Swiss-Prot record:
GO MF annotation, one: proton-transporting ATP synthase activity, rotational mechanism
Family: Belongs to the ATPase delta chain family.
Annotated SUPFAM superfamilies: N-terminal domain of the delta subunit of the F1F0-ATP synthase
Protein name, per record: ATP synthase subunit delta
Cysteines joined through disulfide linkages: none
Any one of the GO CC terms: proton-transporting ATP synthase complex
Pfam families reported for this sequence: OSCP
Function: F(1)F(0) ATP synthase produces ATP from ADP in the presence of a proton or sodium gradient. F-type ATPases consist of two structural domains, F(1) containing the extramembraneous catalytic core and F(0) containing the membrane proton channel, linked together by a central stalk and a peripheral stalk. During catalysis, ATP synthesis in the catalytic domain of F(1) is coupled via a rotary mechanism of the central stalk subunits to proton translocation. This protein is part of the stalk that links CF(0) to CF(1). It either transmits conformational changes from CF(0) to CF(1) or is implicated in proton conduction.
Family annotation (PANTHER family): ATP SYNTHASE DELTA CHAIN
Protein species of origin: Francisella tularensis subsp. holarctica (strain LVS)
Length: 174
């Protein structure tokens, strides 16, 4: 875990516990993602990190647009001058939420876009293999030539043509 992850985790955990207790997981998830995207914007990050404007002032400007509890959460982060780690807080919140809901993320890389039925079949197979709900994130990379590379947590399943060619090459060279 990096230093930012260590700092972000208690915020994410507190946000999750509050949102879960008050049946606000989806709402807080969206709010955290929205603020995460805002902070990733260079102009917003420049304002938040500006020595002339405090992070509290930035959050106070949003008070009327936000739910009181979410505002209080942001105010706490701003008081501790941690607004710039909002993307990490949002990511950790999603990870905690996924564990709670028995969901795992599968990063699936394909050589080209494919039929929805094939993706549904792949999702069903992965759910059986891992015993949980799978949230698939699809990436297209023509360099794999064909097939797929699936990453779920620390597990990598490489059934790509380029992966098979690399294995064949290493066998032939050994």
């Amino acid at each position: 875990m990096t230093n930012i992850s260590v700092i972000a985790k208690p915020y994410a955990k507190a946000a999750f516990e509050f949102a879960n207790e008050h049946n606000l997981l989806q709402q807080w998830s969206k709010l955290l993602q929205t603020f995460s995207e805002l902070i990733k914007d260079k102009s917003v990050a420049a304002i938040v990190s500006s020595p002339t404007i405090s992070q509290i002032e930035v959050v106070d400007a949003l008070k009327k647009q936000l739910d009181e509890n979410f505002f209080n959460f942001l105010a706490l982060i701003a008081e501790n001058k941690k607004m710039l780690i909002m993307p990490e807080i949002a990511d950790q919140f999603e990870s905690i939420k996924n564990i709670h809901n028995n969901v795992r993320v599968a990063d699936v890389t394909l050589a080209y876009a494919t039929d929805k039925n094939i993706l549904d079949s792949l999702k069903t197979s992965l759910e059986k293999k891992f015993g949980c709900t799978i949230d698939m994130h699809i990436n297209i990379d023509p360099a794999i030539i064909g097939g797929a590379v699936v990453k779920v947590g620390d597990t990598v399943i490489d059934s790509s043509v380029s992966g098979h060619l690399e294995k064949l090459k290493s066998i032939l060279l050994s």
